[in-house]
Amino acid sequence: MRLNVPISVRYGETDMMGVVYHANYILYFEDAREKYLAKLGFPYADLEARGLISPVLHVECDYGESVRYGDKVVVQLAVTALKPTKVQFRYKVFDGEEIDLDEAKPFATGMSEHCLIRRDDFKPVSMKKAVPELYERYKAALEPDYQ
């Protein structure tokens, strides 16, 4: 399952060169990921209510064309790898005016990997055991060929 999340670039997200500051792409990814979980029917708040959190293990972003203040972009994401202890998302940032995202060249691409830990002691847990319904939803949404 892919999700397209629209983002309007705000002035405060840009740097002295007038383009989106590089670290803000990671915030866009996080915003899209939060909406993805909600779309799966499992918002972050549900994890937190169970005493679980999902920290970033690894994140990367490759930048292409600059995005500027006032631009409308779309962050497209998909789950691309899943293990009982780890989930991987891939992201593409497109021009928000683009109609056919399958043919469009992304402004940026990225990837993040996340685990699941207990909030109280930061010990890792198996998603498959601790939150099997989330694991199954990720599994059903998995797109390993999404690059």
Each predicted region: which residue ranges?
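Hot-dog-fold acyl-thioester-processing enzymes
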Residues: 1-58, 117-147
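Short, well-ordered turn and helix-capping elements at secondary-structure junctions
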Residues: 11-13, 60-65, 97
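Hydrophobic beta-strand-centered segment that forms part of the acyl-chain substrate-binding groove
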Residues: 36-87, 105-107
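HotDog/MaoC-like acyl-thioester-processing domains
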Residues: 3-5, 68-72, 80-147
